[in-house]
Every structure is written in C-alpha cells, then in structure tokens.
UniProtKB/Swiss-Prot annotation:
InterPro entries: A-crystallin/Hsp20_dom (IPR002068), CS_dom (IPR007052), HSP20-like_chaperone (IPR008978), Small_HSP (IPR031107). It comes from Pisum sativum. The lineage of its organism: Eukaryota, Viridiplantae, Streptophyta, Embryophyta, Tracheophyta. GO terms for cellular component: endoplasmic reticulum lumen. Keywords: Endoplasmic reticulum, Signal, Stress response. Belongs to the small heat shock protein (HSP20) family. PROSITE patterns: SHSP. Forms oligomeric structures. The keyword Endoplasmic reticulum applies. Residues 1-28 form the signal peptide. This is 22.7 kDa class IV heat shock protein.
Length: 197
C-alpha cells in the first residue's frame, strides 16, 4: 500500500491543526478551529463568513416602515477590557455630540446611533468624487455582567466617541439563578441566586 494518498489527506489536516493553534486554545468550544482569535484559520474564516452576531449589532430595530430607502452607514468600533472597566471607541468623523444618541437598557444592551447628513447640492455644483458615507448608523452591544450600567460616561475628541464603563465590585455581580425541579407531589421550592465566584 502506498503512503502517498494517506499523506495527501494527512498533511492538510495537520496544517489545519497548526493554523488553529489546536489544542491549546480549543477549551471546549464548539468551533475550536475558528473560535481562537489571531490564528490563520480564524482570519480566513472571518473574511468569508462574517459573525452573525456582529451583523446584528448594526441592524436597528426601530426603523420606521415609511422609510424604505434608509441608508445605514458603518461605524467602526474598538472595545477593550481593562482591570478597571470597559472602553468602547466608535469612529464618528464629522459628527457633533448632538448628532449622536447613546442608550443603555436594563437588559444590558448599549446602543449608539446617529446620522451623518449629506451636504445639500447647490445649483451649479458638479461632484467629481463622492466617497464619504452618509446616513444613519447604529451599533449595539450586549454588556457583560461585570459592567456597572450607571457608570457609563461618553466623550468625543477628534472624531472618536469614547465610552467608559466601570466594573462592578465582585460582591455586586449577580450570578445565575438556580431553579429546582419539583415533582408533582412536592411543594414548589424557592429560586436561589448564587454569587459568581
């Protein structure tokens, strides 16, 4: 038996494992090869198949039905976590603070929206190039449990909106609720709220 057909199958599989940095970063992920950031395979995957949750971050739920020609522009975002909190930076060049709306909902959703209005054409104007994007933009983020929703602060500088969110102290983070299963003869039990450790 020749080893050549076996090598043709084995070599791509080994390259796939090496590109994904497996098994160091798998950690019980359903998608161990593409779930690890900064790997060759994750970069190739994300270019071809965008993350559906990131796509949903940009879809506004409140678009009116009488606005069929609404234009959504993309606002680029960076989000980092520090020991003290979270910092979200949104590119909003050319906008003033009155053009931007920031909302925090009780279900831990942070929304940033706004509109970049197109310059009105004056009689006699002839555009040679139009590359800047105009229209409404919308980004929303599901905030982690450790964010203090009352601590959100925003500032704008040089076309960048920076949102700062402080972390809750460990004893104030609510853990998952444990629900007991009862049988027909048993009395219903209380719901217990465990603290995250």
């Amino acid at each position: 038996m020749s080893l050549k057909p076996l090598n043709m199958l084995l070599v791509p599989f080994l390259l796939l494992i090496l590109a994904a940095d497996f098994p160091l970063k798998a950690k019980a992920s359903l998608l161990p090869f593409i779930d690890s950031p900064n790997t060759l395979l994750s970069d190739l995957w994300s270019d071809r198949f965008p993350d559906p949750f990131r796509v949903l971050e940009q879809i506004p739920y409140g678009v009116e039905k009488h606005e069929p020609s609404i234009t959504l522009s993309h606002a680029r975002v960076d989000w980092k976590e520090t020991p003290e909190g979270h910092v979200i930076m949104v590119d909003v060049p050319g906008l003033k603070k009155d053009d931007i709306k920031i909302e925090v909902e009780e279900n831990r959703v942070l929304r940033v929206s706004g509109e970049r209005k197109k310059e009105e054409d004056k009689k006699g104007d002839h555009w040679h190039r139009v590359e800047r994007s105009y229209g409404k933009f919308w980004r929303q983020f599901k905030l982690p449990q450790n964010v203090d929703l009352d601590s959100v602060k925003a500032k704008m500088e040089n076309g960048v909106l920076t949102l700062t969110l402080h972390k809750l102290s460990h004893d104030k983070i609510k853990g998952p609720r444990m629900v007991s299963i009862v049988e027909e003869d048993d009395k219903p039990s209380k719901i217990v709220n465990d603290e995250l450790k």
